[in-house]
A protein has these predicted regions:
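Conserved beta-strand positions in the central sheet of alpha/beta enzyme cores
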Residues: 33, 67-69, 106, 144, ...
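Histidine-acidic metal/acid-base catalytic patches
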Residues: 1-7, 14-28, 101, 156-175, ...
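Active-site beta-loop-alpha junctions enriched in small/polar residues
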Residues: 9-13, 35-39, 70-73, 110-112, ...
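Glycine-rich, proline-tolerant flexible connector loops at the mouths of alpha/beta enzymes
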Residues: 33-55, 59, 110-116, 211
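Active-site acidic/histidine proton-transfer and metal-coordination neighborhood
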Residues: 16-22, 59-60, 64, 76-173, ...
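N-terminal-biased segments
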Residues: 6-18, 44-54, 85-90
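A short acidic, helix-capping loop that chelates divalent metal ions and anchors anionic groups
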Residues: 38-43, 74-79, 113-118, 182-183, ...
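Mobile, glycine- and charge-enriched loop segments
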Residues: 2-10, 59, 64
Length: 290
């Protein structure tokens, strides 16, 4: 399909970067979203480490990087030390992105205190995001806000608020079907409201009954119909990025505030490579019908 590229969070295949690249190439994929490699998160790499270690392996495999799967913004809103650390990490991540010829960095809008009204923290969220955006503007990189669970921008109304208020060419939306399902939202309404800001799509599905992730197209994310709308009717071009969450993987615990086993209660495939391949083929089957 012209101008549609399938990428994915390859650390769901294996913690080994070589195994990630091997599986990706066997599937015929040419891109990954770089979240972690060899059990090390992308935000913990130096520019030199990426240049001398990861980049040569990417080039040898013929694999490009669609986005940096960073943890930026995945700290508590009142964690000032954590925020300052992430500002420094974002500077490095922007330099890494340029080295990898990658213009997108995935990020979040801060964890809210449990039991508190997110509206009480809106001003603090906006202020801190403006600082992140200023760094991105300096490096000409685009920050993509993912509608992650339990952050300020986890529901539609607050996602729209962020996009409209910040109104920056360097702050856009990475649309995640499953997260909206798990937050009780209608993905079709979310798509329509956020469409002017969406530059990237995560392929992850879920059901609302137990909030479990399921193979794409089999849950309540309305992935087939919304991808058809996006690509065929609206002319979306760019990346569709696999994030299966069908098998427990090493880096998951570092991404979540709860026990990883509460996120993926049971492995739906025998290993990460099999689950990743299943998600890839399910997406290809959806696209083949367009």
């Amino acid at each position: 399909m012209k101008d549609i590229y399938i990428s994915g969070f390859a650390d769901e295949i294996s913690s080994s970067f070589d195994e990630q690249l091997k599986t990706v190439r066997e599937l015929g994929m040419q891109y990954i979203s770089l979240r972690s490699a060899d059990k090390k998160g992308i935000a913990d790499f130096t520019v030199e480490e990426v240049k001398t270690d990861l980049l040569p392996r990417l080039q040898a495999a013929g694999v490009g990087v669609s986005s940096s799967g960073s943890p930026i913004g995945k700290v508590k809103i009142d964690d000032e030390e954590g925020f300052e650390k992430q500002c420094a990490q974002l500077e490095t991540l922007c330099e890494i992105a340029k080295l990898l010829d990658c213009k997108y960095i995935r990020m979040f809008s801060f964890f809210m205190p449990e039991g508190k009204d997110p509206a009480d923290y809106r001003d603090a969220v906006i202020e801190k995001l403006r600082k992140f955006i200023a760094i991105a503007e300096k490096h000409d990189v685009i920050l993509m806000h993912e509608n992650e669970k339990d952050i300020y921008g986890d529901v539609l109304s607050r996602c729209v608020d962020l996009m409209q208020t910040l109104n920056s060419a360097h702050f856009k939306s990475a649309f995640d079907f499953a997260n909206f399902v798990q937050c009780g939202e209608d993905t079709a309404k979310c798509w329509d409201a956020l469409r002017p800001y969406i530059v990237y799509i995560h392929i992850k599905d879920a059901v609302s009954t137990d909030k479990e992730n399921v193979l794409c197209g089999t849950g309540e994310g309305k992935i087939p119909e919304l991808l058809h709308k996006a690509i065929v009717e609206e002319g979306y071009t760019g990346f569709l990025t696999l994030e299966p969450h069908l098998v427990l993987f090493d880096s998951l615990q570092s991404l979540e505030t709860t026990d990883a086993k509460n996120i993926i209660r049971e492995n739906k495939y025998k290993n990460g490579a099999e689950g990743y391949a299943a998600q890839y083929h399910a997406l290809c089957d959806i696209l083949a019908k367009f």
